[in-house]
Amino acid sequence: MRNSASSNKNNNKGQNDFAEMEYMNITVVTSNEPYGLFDSSNPFFYKRRTPKFNLTLGGVHSGHVQRGLRDPICISTSGKGNCRDGYTKETSGPDSVRVLVATRAKPSKNLNSELDREFYDHFLEVLNRPEETGRFHFSTQFLYYREELFIAELNNSRLGGKPVVFDMDMSAGDFLSLFYLLKVPVEIIDLKAVIVSPTGWANTATIDVVYDLLHMMGRDDIPVGLGDMFAINQSEPVFPSAGDCKYAKAVPQGCGGFLDSDTLYGLARDLPRSPRRYENSVAHGAPSDTDRPELRQPLALEVWQNLTKSVDEVSKITVLTNGPLTSLAKIISSDKNSSSIIKEVYIVGGHISRGKSDKGNIFTVPSNSYAEFNMFLDPLAAKTVLESGLNITLIPLATQREFSFQAMLNRLYSSTKTPEARFVKRLLTRLQALHQKQRRYMHMDMFLGEILGAIFLGGDHALLKPKMRTEYIKVIAEGDESKDGHILIDKLRGKQIKILERVDLRGCYESFASRLDDKKQSAVIGSFEEQRMKWNTPPSYKPITARIFH
């Protein structure tokens, strides 16, 4: 429509080849009848002498604003919704704006066309033009493109490491932690599975970046399970695919939030691409098929259930969580035997305030001064896990805050012999630069502290010199955003947990950097650029590759 209308310079009414145009006075409905009532749901009018934006009392913006998907005022006795928030409506008066509207699509000029709209025909004709044709798939872009799976062959003589499940929300710090866990010798840590929780700092699709990192490190054999999209009690009971973002909205969209996490701060495409991707199909309830509808992304609970079938009493599972506790809470609630299978839980997160000046890190919710993000993003899950009676070690915000970008980078700069060490150095350098130069990225240092859980789990405690203490705690989860996620000391009714109070920072930096620099269990394919070179070279080996740790 835009291109057609702009071809006529004197066309003031937007006339075009594809739709009939008409000027209308419209508005977007933000409230519902009856209008003019003082409803606490409406921030434009409630407790205001003058309506916001000079809106009209009694106009279409002065009624009840829908609160949630199951707002009782919006549900009729028949069960159907009667609210119109978000509708576009023709109206008049100062609450409306005059715009040019396409009122009807014009029929196809080609009477023999199977399509009944002119813009359908035109759209397909433009897409099929040979000019500027795109190559949208690696198989057409690269002459020798081939999919490979790198499966680690672990000799039985080398097994015996602690079985670990890593529960992450795909923040930058989680990827740093995953690199470290994959570098720890399998005799110490045997990473059995990765669970991703989309209730934290990244969207669901970022699971593909997890697959890419595992592919880079030659561990396509490690299963990845997808957790719930919403925090506990935030999904719609009738339609679980929808829900409330009461807590998730605290994560910024940009500026160190979803956009940066989803792209790993612009570095995600530097990782080699894994054949494993998020897959789903209409047959399994998805709105459309992905490239491989015969496959389906396993859920977190499914991965857990498959894993528990393969472990025995001698090798109970250790869980390391680096994000909201949504997935672990669901496992505890649904698997009654989980307490006998889980040996210990290491939780990176939580804040136990020592005074008014000792505040948390919820910088987007001014009313909540003393919570930490991983607890706040799903407070009910945090309460379920921390008060479950499991053997829990908490690695709180205060301990994480001791980490320094510059000190860590100074140690990494001294030696970067492996692809993974070079990638980690680039990511940390970018986080530090943003932290120093951009006011809206002042929270970048909290991602650095997230690596402490992995270091504490897989590092040499003689080098780390940890200091522990025991506390009895409880978690606030009352539905009040100003209090949810707070962890309080309660010596009478609280649950006992261990708290990592302090570590030797120099030992942590040394443990992290030296492990990444170790050429054992190093990257199988170092970067996407290296992968491109392979795809432009005739193959000389089988499509499925097995790798043995040396």
Curated annotation (Swiss-Prot):
Localization annotation: Cytoplasm
GO molecular function: hydrolase activity, hydrolyzing N-glycosyl compounds
One Pfam family linked to the record: IU_nuc_hydro
Coiled-coil regions listed in the entry: none
GO cellular component annotations of the record: cytoplasm
Alphabetic keyword roster: Cytoplasm, Hydrolase
Enzyme Commission no: 3.2.2.-
Family of the protein in this entry: Belongs to the IUNH family.
Role summary: May be involved in the degradation of nucleosides.
Protein name: Nucleoside hydrolase 4
Taxonomic lineage of the native organism: Eukaryota, Viridiplantae, Streptophyta, Embryophyta, Tracheophyta
Gene, per the UniProt record: NSH4
